Amino acid sequence: MKLIIKNLILLLVSCLYFLSNVSCDQEVHMALLLEGQVDDLGINYEVNQGLAETEALIQRAAKVINDANSYDSTYDNIKSLLDQDNPYNLIITSSESQMSAALDIASDYEDTYFLIFGDMGDKKVPHSKVGTYYFNLVSPHFVLGFIAGGMGKSVGMVVPGPPTENYFTANAFYAGMKYYTSPAGAPNPSLSVVATSSYDDYDTATGAGRILLTKDIDICTQSQTDMTVANMFLNASKWAFGTNGFPQSNIYGNRIIQSVVHNFQVPFYEAATMVMKNTWKNGYNFFGDFNNNFFYLDYYSFLVDPLLKNQTEDLISTIKGGAKPYITNGLTYEKILEQTKLSTGITDLGYYAVPTTEVYTTGSINKTFMAVSILEMAICLIIGIIVIFFFSRNINIIYSTIPYCLTILLGASLIAVAIFLWNLRDLNTQICTSKIWMASLGYNVLIGFIIIKSSLIYFKFKEMVKSKNEKISPIPFGRIVLWFVPLLIIDCVLLIIYSTSGNPGKIDSLGLDGIGRYEYTQNCVNNLTGDIILYIILVFHGLQLLYGCVIAWKTRVIDLEEFIEAHDFATAIYLITFCSFIIVILMVGVTSTSNRNTIISACAIFSSFSCVLIIFGAKFWKIYKPVEDDGLPQIKLKPQKSYSGSGGSGNSSGSKSKKTSAHSSTSGVKSGTSAPTQTSQSAMASINIQNFVNPIEASSRAAAQNDN
């Protein structure tokens, strides 16, 4: 019995010991985001290959998402991976373009592990479960440059160039060429570099490759993500290096002298293992290089001498041992990455860009608007001359005042100038800024002076009705200006902010409005602040129109001939408001910049030109053809009792007749009317109602009768 108990205790202790040494692995659900397609035989292929090897090692399936090449697509894809019933707990990115989105969403998911690709620099990870990985950007090109130096060939290299990528790849390659000690009598290798401002643009890479092929260059290399330039050299029976992480000899054979292969399985497996074993290192950072087997060389081409192979392997061993032969002249690795100039000895072939052609398909439309705007300015000038020199003493002009008439013409002319600038072909910053100023100030003057005078007329009319005062006098121009100054200040402040903070300017827009990729049109642009200020300016003018419609509705009851222009003002305001609604409706469905400019120009010309014709056309028509008797009957008033003081119809008529006579003398016309005198109760007074309500027309008829 004791033996049985002893054996049971021993068995229990053994089980406890065994269980205590068994690790409780955590389930791993990996997901990888690629910037491009998995089958590109480049960086995306190698990243996916590293994930596939990691899957085999940990025996866990993973998910791969292609084309996560923007902030929004990266953020949305990661969020969908984490908001599932069985969420992924290890998210891996593969491009620096995905870094910002991954860091942002990682701050909201502190229980999820992230392995983010890229150089963090001064950025901080949001929590301890966020790790990073990157690789040496210099050592691979240094090693390939060493091989090129040993071959003694002329090499051409295509790089993005600053500001897309500094010249550290070209300088590292050239440093490797010089690091090789050529034997006596061996040819000196050379390096020529062309920049394209892009990692993967096919057209610019092709153009850069053509430049290198015309320079009697034997071998090409590059720091781009595809093999466009290499293919051009291989098709021309020349040779190339593989630099995008894929073992290019698998495709092109011995025509690829050597490739530096990226082994992404190393960081992926290390991160997945830490998640499984729950041994994640805070601040985990992997920096790939030859010393941790992230980089390794592909098969050598038969073109490489065996001695050079051995020398290259010795160089790799030196780097694995911790040496950094690519660091010269006391520069640190970080300083090498900051090099914006090519090293002395490199032939700089400059930047290549695909030639662009300007497209100008709206020439006839623009010329038409420019001609109409010039015509509008000319008509405004002619009207101003006529008002000043021919009708300055006409009562229709006197009640408007000459300065007011000229100010209305000035506002319309400023709008015409804006439309002229809007349709110029050759643009610059000054033109782009000036057209906004002219349009805003023009409408501010035109609308502002109309609504202010309409308001003053309405207030004066209400005061006359309230006080029963029949004395009528023109609205002083100075009073209108005083009311307009605040509107002008607001407009100028907004325009100054737009000019200083909105950064308006001209840009050559490639491929805009359906034209070719390398065709461009000149357009005016501004930044986000400029857009906001423009919207505020539009709201400002919209409020002016809204108030104008209200005051126009109120002035409909004014029947005094001296203030009849208030009805013309109302028509002008309604017209501008209608055009504004038309612009909004048309602009909603229009995406073409040229079509938008056409709509703006047409509505601006129509509204401003029509306002001038409405306001001054009515005035000139009354001057040219005074209103005749409208056929109203001569009403004989019955005898009324005479009251003390001024009263009764006779006095009222007499007062009105005196005022009419004064108006006639002011306009240079001698009045032939006289006020009837009040007699006894039996006297009969006969008046013409038209003389009472329309004194200007009465004086005009009197002048016509005298002429006869």
Curated annotation (Swiss-Prot):
Residues 392-401, 457-479, 553-568, 619-708 are cytoplasmic. One of its GO terms (molecular function) is lipopolysaccharide binding. It comes from the Eukaryota. Induction: Down-regulated by Pseudomonas aeruginosa, PAO1 strain infection and up-regulated by Pseudomonas aeruginosa, PA14 strain infection. Residues 25-370, 423-435, 501-531, 590-597 are extracellular. InterPro entries: GPCR_3_C (IPR017978), mGluR/GABA-B-like (IPR051530), PnrA-like (IPR003760). This is Metabotropic glutamate receptor-like protein L.
